[in-house]
């Protein structure tokens, strides 16, 4: 082993590679931590332990609480020929699902998108102007008892359970999405849980991706949410 020659790039490149790998390691750890708290706090039994045993839950199918649509065919050539500020979301899962930006705007407001093909069943919360490709399903909440962010969190967990593995191309169709059943506590509780989990997820990402000058502030904010969530979990377990 001692005699095996190993080639090294210049020190600055070594350090850059090490930093990138450390960032990926940190991001994976944060994502696991977020997923643990999300799954734990969205559990119906745990919600009742936090807010009271008599908290009512209502069960709906997605089709009963949402308008369900699908995106349209948007090619890379179309994106090149129609540049603009509004993102196009596709069935991709990297880069938040962005395929590019165009001047069109098919959707504007608070929505949920999901990937229908390929990496099917991946769910994203959207808020603003955007477009969706034909491999992307779109949900718009129409029931005032439902918090869109809370629904997106539930679907992050549940949607992948309904993916059909057809040959080598997994699929989650509009029809299947429409039939998924989900249970919801009162709106006020949905909003509280969604706000804390979404803030925690954002801080986890900002801590990894942010500029150095902001890291210390992000860590303090993250510590606050970690303690808040930890205390919730302890309350449930006790």
Curated annotation (Swiss-Prot):
Give UniProt keywords alphabetically.
DNA-binding, Restriction system
Gene Ontology molecular function: DNA binding
Q: Which GO terms describe its biological process?
A: DNA restriction-modification system
Cited Pfam families: Methylase_S
Keyword Coiled coil assigned to the entry: answer is: no
Tell me its family. Answer: Belongs to the type-I restriction system S methylase family.
Q: What does this protein do?
A: The specificity (S) subunit of a type I methyltransferase (MTase); this subunit dictates DNA sequence specificity. The single R subunit has multiple frameshifts and is probably not expressed.
Domain description? Contains two DNA recognition domains, each specifying recognition of one of the two defined components of the target sequence.
Q: What is said about its interaction partners and assembly?
A: The methyltransferase is composed of M and S polypeptides.
**Name under which the protein is recorded:** Putative type I specificity subunit S.MpnORF201P
């Amino acid at each position: 082993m001692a005699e095996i020659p190993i080639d090294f790039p210049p020190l600055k490149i070594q350090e850059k590679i090490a930093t990138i790998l450390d960032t990926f390691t940190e991001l994976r750890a944060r994502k696991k931590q977020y997923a643990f708290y999300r799954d734990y706090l969205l559990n119906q039994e745990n919600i009742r332990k936090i807010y009271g045993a008599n908290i009512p839950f209502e069960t709906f199918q997605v089709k009963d609480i949402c308008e369900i649509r699908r995106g349209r065919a948007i090619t890379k050539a179309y994106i090149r020929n129609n540049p603009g500020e509004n993102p196009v979301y596709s069935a991709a899962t990297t880069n938040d699902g962005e395929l590019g930006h165009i001047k069109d705007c098919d959707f504007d407001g608070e929505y949920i998108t999901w990937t229908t093909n390929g990496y099917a069943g991946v769910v994203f919360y959207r808020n603003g102007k955007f477009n969706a490709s034909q491999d992307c399903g779109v949900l718009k909440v129409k029931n005032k008892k439902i918090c869109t962010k809370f629904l997106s969190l539930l679907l992050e967990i549940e949607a992948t359970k309904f993916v059909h593995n057809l040959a080598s191309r997994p699929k989650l169709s509009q029809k299947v999405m429409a039939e998924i059943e989900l249970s919801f506590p009162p709106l006020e509780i949905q909003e509280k849980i969604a706000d804390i989990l979404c803030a925690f997820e954002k801080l986890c990402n900002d801590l990894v991706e942010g500029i150095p000058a902001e890291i210390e502030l992000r860590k303090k904010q993250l510590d606050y949410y970690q303690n808040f969530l930890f205390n919730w979990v302890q309350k449930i377990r006790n």
